Amino acid sequence: NRELGKRDSMTTASTTDLALMAHLLRRAGFGADRDQLERYAEKSYEDVVDDLLNPERFDEPEDEVLSRFYPHLHANKDNPAVWNGRWFYRMVNTERPLEEKMTLFWHGVFATGWTKSEHTPTMVQHIQMLRTNGMANFRTLLLGISRDPAMIFWLDNNENHGSSINENYGREILELFSMGIGNYTEDDIKNAARAFTGWTYEQPIPLYPYGQRDVEFLFRADDHDNDEKTFLGHTGNLDGNDIIDIIATQEATARFIGRHLYNFFVADEAQVPAWSIEPPVDPAAIDDLVKTWMDSDADIRAVLRTLFTSDWFKAARFKRVKSPTEFVAAVLKLSGDYREPDTDLHKLEGTIVAMGQKLMDPPSVEGWHTGKEWIDGGTLTERVNYAINTLNDPEKPGVRAIVDRIRSGGDATSPAQFVDSLLDLVGPLELESETRDTLLAHAEKDGPLEWGSDESASASTERVVQLLTLVVSAREYQFN
C-alpha cells in the first residue's frame, strides 16, 4: 500500500492545477489541507482519479486505534453518536476519500434509519455494506441492500410472505432505489414483492428482549413464492436475484442513478420527487453517464470515471450546497482537528443534527432533501457559529499552517495580498466581487501585515485568524 497523493516528482503545480485538484477532492472526498493538495497536484489529474477509484491500494483508517479510545464500544454497542463519531474520523483521516464519499452518497439513496429498529449494530453493518460495495457493480450493491437486515426491517420485508405479500420493498426498490416513478407498473411492484418473499433475517431486530448482537440475512425457502411471475416483460419463476439482474440492465435505472450521481457530485438538481416532471440540469451529462452504465454493464466505478474526467464536472465548481456532513468535515480538514482520536468525536453528531442531518437516521425512505433546502436561518447560523468557533484558534494545526504560509510571504504583506493569499489557502475559494470587497475593506482597516517583531507578529496572527473566520462565514463557503 502507498500514500494517496504521494509525490512522484518535484514539479510545482500551477494555480490552475491546484484549483482543479481542490475541486476534485471536495467532490470525491471531503477536501484537503494545503499540504495534501500540493502533494495530490504533483500527480496528473487522471492518476489521482484512478487512485480515488481504487481505494484498495491504500491502507484503511486505523479503527483499532479508535477502539482504544472507546473501550465502551465493546460493552455498549447501542450508541449511534459514537459510531457516527468514528465515521467522521474516517472522513477526515482516510487515505481512501472516495470510498467514504460513496458510502455517504448511497446512504442518502438507500435511506435506512435507526429510529425504527433502534438497533445500532445492524445500522453499523448497513453502513459497512455500503462502504464495501459502493463502487462495485450495481447488481452487487443492490443485492447487498436487498439482503441487508437493516433494510429488510426498515421496509418490512420480514413481513413479506409467500402466502401474504408486503409490497413496501417491492415498491421502493423501483421507485427510489433504481428506476424512478413512471418506469414500471403496479403489477411490476407486486411481482417484485413476490420475488422477494422469504428474504428475511435470522432474529428480530428490536433492542429488547433480543439484545445488541449482530443480525444476519436469512432466506426461508418455505416462505418463498415459487409461482410464475412477470416483471418488466420477463416471465418465469423469478426470485430476488432475477429482479435485481433485470433492474440493473434497464436504461431507466442508469438514468435515475446517473441523475443521483450528478446531483451529489456535480450540481444541485431538483428534489427527487420532482424528477418525473422536471428535466435534468444537464441532460447531455446524464446521457454520458447512461452510455457508460450500459456499455459497462452497470459498473459503478466506470460511471464514476466518466463523471470525474468529464469537462462538465471540471467546470462545475461551487455548484452544490454542502450537506451538514460535508460542511463539518471540510471545517475539520481546515482546522486540523481530530487528526488523532479524541473522546469528543461523538459530539459531532449533535453538531450536524443542529444543521439538519443525522447520519444513520434519515428522515424517511426518501432520504434528505438537498441543495438549498439544507439552508434556512437557523441552520445557516449553526454553520457559521460552528466554523467560527472551530477556526478561531491559532494553535490548531490547520490554522497555524495557514498563518505560517501567509507569514512566509514576507513582511509588509499588503491587504490585497493578504486577502488573496487567504482565499487561495482556504480553497482556492471563488468569491463574488462584493464579498471580496468586504473582506478587503476589513483587511485595509489595519494596513499591511507586519511580522518583524513579536508584538507585530502576534497582532498579524490575530488578524489572519479573524479574517479566516470571516471567509468561512461567507455565503460562498456554503458551496462545494
Explain the meaning of each model-derived region.
Residues 30, 42, 96-97, 135, ...:
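Alpha-helix boundary/capping and short turn/kink residues
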